């Protein structure tokens, strides 16, 4: 009932963070935190999938397993070196059953992108750099100025989130360079990612205090990120652990449509699975602002146009599933409702604010989220509905992502605006 038609999800078991996103030898590889045994967190492995186009995904065998029942292969990244694929990841040992450091950084290698061999010299980073560090995980590695650069999520004394920087010439021997960023609003930072877009260094990171993905944009200079602007990478409730692809000529990011906040309410567990990835998005900088938009490849999902109108009103859609895209262009203000007789999601745009209300979206409930927006002569909202999620993009600039669980088809669409053009496209089921 709730299995997505065009989002990536595990056929069975639990999935969380995307890991090791890489474009390698003409294909997009996505690894992810995975428990193949049951739809709950635990026994964490690295699941693996591959795509030719970022849209149609194929499941592959598990890439990395833990060595012991009390261990886990936690989040990390992938890079290419000498034609081979290298995975850099956090290895976890449950401290209640194991001695020594609970989180260390390790490496695995593959020549074919399918079979991975763990490095005999693991761990390549055996302990945190200083006392008081209570989190030490999620290495994201990129190439910069002729060397490998790793950022790690961390925390200090259960009070402040930190991002640590390491450098290496060979992926096996790492030098600690220091703390490049701190966030006092959270006790730890997870899944950091440092990318450069144009002339800007952009740190993307997740914080446990609000289960959100944030960005800080500025310049990395003399071992510190000098922040010029910061904000949310996504303004919804359910976007987390975002990571960018290695090896692409643009910055493409995927996040986990997270299940932490309302895990017990999610009915997908009854279907034997839990976890959905976001649609792939492109990040870019325009007018000194970090912006986000759906990747162009998603246009290939459109099967047929099921509805269009150039006026306000309430309309019945010819759809059999919650699997469609709405494209709405308008001037000024708008109220857009998508739902059925008992469930709905409401998007409201006033002069300078966009509000999304998912409180009546389905059995798992929801929240109201809002963001300040810049009004344009013609505004555009793209909404992607897919069984158990909805993602909104406004003016190819900001995004809102939510997990929802409607019990019936959203076949009623209501729009109120002075000037509007609205189209609805049925989208392909990539799993058939």
From Swiss-Prot:
GO terms for biological process: carbohydrate metabolic process. The active site is at 17. The keyword Hydrolase applies. It holds the Pfam family Glyco_hydro_32N. It catalyses: Hydrolysis of terminal non-reducing beta-D-fructofuranoside residues in beta-D-fructofuranosides. InterPro entries: ConA-like_dom_sf (IPR013320), GH32_Enzymes (IPR051214), Glyco_hydro_32 (IPR001362), Glyco_hydro_32_AS (IPR018053), Glyco_hydro_32_C (IPR013189), Glyco_hydro_32_N (IPR013148), Glyco_hydro_beta-prop_sf (IPR023296). GO terms for molecular function: beta-fructofuranosidase activity. Optimum temperature is 90-95 degrees Celsius. Highly thermostable. It is an enzyme of class 3 (hydrolase). Signal peptide: none annotated. The keyword Hydrolase applies. Keywords: Glycosidase, Hydrolase. Its EC number is 3.2.1.26. SUPFAM superfamilies: Arabinanase/levansucrase/invertase, Concanavalin A-like lectins/glucanases. Belongs to the glycosyl hydrolase 32 family. Hydrolysis of sucrose, raffinose, inulin and levan. Specific for the fructose moiety and the beta-anomeric configuration of the glycosidic linkages of its substrates. The enzyme released fructose from sucrose and raffinose, and the fructose polymer inulin is hydrolyzed quantitatively in an exo-type fashion. This is Beta-fructosidase.
